[in-house]
């Protein structure tokens, strides 16, 4: 038997943190149904869809709990009845969406509002519900969205797994064959004290050759038949490895899911954006120039004659994608210095959040 039939938990969740999760669990434990409503402004740095996804991941399987998000671009003014009603209009609309999803539009009303904020009393009053304060002094979880935005790295331990994966600053090193991507990415991970994610494409190639030899023991690298599915598999597995490796605020990757689209172009002879349509947008791409780097044949490489073309393909693709990137050139030491400088700037920029509407 629960205390309430339908509870509302409403906030920006910008970003979701341990205090938010404590609040949601408290509401769900005492309510038959719980609607978590994420209201985000378009001026804010984290899209509402991301916040909703992170909350859903953390609270998956909670009976009666639904997380919904919507846009609320109204200014905040707790002294204005008119402004209050603008926000409440959005909140009621989201509660209506929940009721429609449940197949019972008449069940939209709530009988409890769970919150840790001072506006909880007024919100509950306007909804004809009871306000249930949860840790308003933040003694159980001494964290706030403001604190996380001000210094995400210092508050990293207050973030759930899905939020960490989504917020992590990813540094991705890409480049043509034998241009030092693996060496540079390893060096960066060591210098930054960050996890390192190896390239999956090589492992897939080795496995593909082994599979081909199950049909023809004499099969060689040059005779492999590459398909779109191969590169979709590479992109998917590269993303899985990357997400699994996230622990701290920074991650260094030797290639990523998007890079698989460039290699698909190289082996299939045409652009294939469908290889990785939902690839992450890293904090920074580093493109290793082929100029000045001798080609080293390790038995698995076949693109010495295409290195300049591949460098241009990466350069064009990165520019078109509109992501932060930098070409690193010169000696190994020069490349490392350039990369470290670019990483410092990129990580600082990545963790700079727009202020919420006040």
Language model regions located:
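Glycine-rich phosphate-binding loop used to anchor ATP phosphates in small-molecule kinases
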Residues: 230-280, 295
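A glycine- and Lys/Arg-enriched "phosphate-lid" helix/loop adjacent to the NTP-binding pocket
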Residues: 148, 268-334, 347, 356-357
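Conserved substrate/cofactor phosphate-moiety recognition/catalytic segment
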Residues: 186, 190-243, 339
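Nucleotidyltransferase catalytic core that binds NTPs
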Residues: 1-169
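Glycine-rich phosphate-binding P-loop
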Residues: 171-189
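Short loop/turn segments at strand-loop or loop-helix junctions that form parts
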Residues: 38-39, 69-73, 199-201, 255-257, ...
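A structural motif corresponding to the C-terminal end of an alpha-helix
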Residues: 62, 108, 127-128, 246-248, ...
